[in-house]
Amino acid sequence: MDQDAAQDSAGLIAEAKGIAISPTMQRRVLVATSNPGKLRDFAGAAEVYGITMVAIPNFSSLPLVLEDGATFEANARKKAEAYSLAVEGELVLADDSGLEIDALGGAPGVHSARYANEEPHLLDSNIKDEANNARVLRELAGMPPEKRTGRFVCVLAAARDGHTLQTFRGVAEGIILDAPRGTDGFGYDPLFFVPQIGKTFAELNAVEKAQYSHRGAALRKFLDWLSPGQRM
C-alpha cells in the first residue's frame, strides 16, 4: 500500500471510531527508541489517527542517555529533551515504563529494564527479558495470586528542540503469574495477567494491546493532545 492509500485507510478507520483528524495535525512523530516491541505498540495505536511513528534516524548511533531519574516522568523527560536536540524542529516522543509489584515494594519500577543486569543495552533483548522475568519469579516464589498484584506504568514525554512540551501517564493493573504465558509480547508481558480479559499481555493481539496496555493508555492521551493540530 502506498503512503497516500495508507493515510486514506487510516482516515476511514478513524472516522469509524469517531476520531476527528485535522488537516493540520502533526503527521509524523519520531520515537526515541530502538526497541521493536515498543515501536509496534506505538505504530499500531497511532495508525487510526493517521499519524506515522518511526524511530529517530540513526538512533543507535546517538549517545546513550543515562536513565538515572527517580521516577518514570524524570527519565522520560530527560530522554525526550536530549534526543530532540539531535533532530532539530521535529516532535520527539520518549517513553519510560516499567512494572511495579506491590509485594516487592514497587520494584522493579524504574529499574525494570535492568532488574537482572545494570547494563541491559549490552545484552540480547531476549536474554535480558528472560533474566528479568526469572528474577521476578524467584522473588515471588510461593506467593498466592492475591499477593501478586502489580501494574505496568508508562510515561511519555513529547519534546521539541530540547524542551518538554507535555507528559502523559498510562497505567494497567494486573497479576503476576508464576510462569510465563504467550509469545507475542516482550519484557514482562508473558507474566502480566489481566483478569478483565483473561489473558497475559503476551497473549494479546495488536488491537487488544493498544486497548488494554499502559502504553496504549498513555499514547491515547498523547494522540488526543496532538489531534487538534497542537505543536506544529
Identify the residue ranges that each predicted region occupies.
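Intrinsic-disorder-associated, low-complexity terminal segments enriched in Asp/Asn/His/Tyr and depleted
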Residues: D2-D4, D8
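Anionic-ligand binding patches
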Residues: A16-L30, P36-M232
